[in-house]
Amino acid sequence: VEAEDLILCGGAVGSPQLLLLSGVGPADHLQDMGITLHHELPGVGQNLRDHPNVRIPVRVREDFPLDSEAPRTQLALRYTAAGSSDRNDMQILQSSFSSPMGGDPLEGEGIRFTCIIELAMGAGELKLTSTDPQVQPDLNYRYLEEPWDRERLREGVRLCLKLLEHPKYQDFVEDCISPTPKDLESDDDLDQWLLRNVTTTQHISGTCKMGPDSDPMAVVDQY
């Protein structure tokens, strides 16, 4: 390859994994793994960012057309959470077909909303589980550890349920599969539901953070 600038990147999982296996990263973690430290760089594998989301599946009437091969998501609602200083920090997706989590993707259970935090305060970390590069590292997302993330996601779920009360939805919606009325009795109950159901949007980033020399957690700079 001939070019002025070459960027070697293994993605948000592969890049920190490769650096750690090469002895570049947090000294204590490398010592725990029995890897010789060549360059201490504490930010490697830290600052794991994602867009935490929860799915709200909804049961529909039998005459509603559920087509597993049709475009499922063609509409998105971007909005700013109440009290947020970050514009459009939340997103709600509506899908015309929903399959059970972890089940057959072609098995229809109804429609669904997906409520997403676009700029979460919380961050996780990536750590090695083996010195074998073929072994998947451990991804600890630490979802919803920050109270502000839980507050915004609670608001998003309640907004989805409010949308379902609109007459246009009531024309074909039977009921909400999850969360249940019991899950909605209090903020604490809803928080427990969130923690049981929060998952990845598969938008991982940040594990080799870019920043200036003054940032001790920066891994690379703009050059």
Describe each model-derived feature in a short phrase.
Residues R61-P65, R72-Y223:
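FAD-dependent oxidoreductase catalytic-site/capping-region signature
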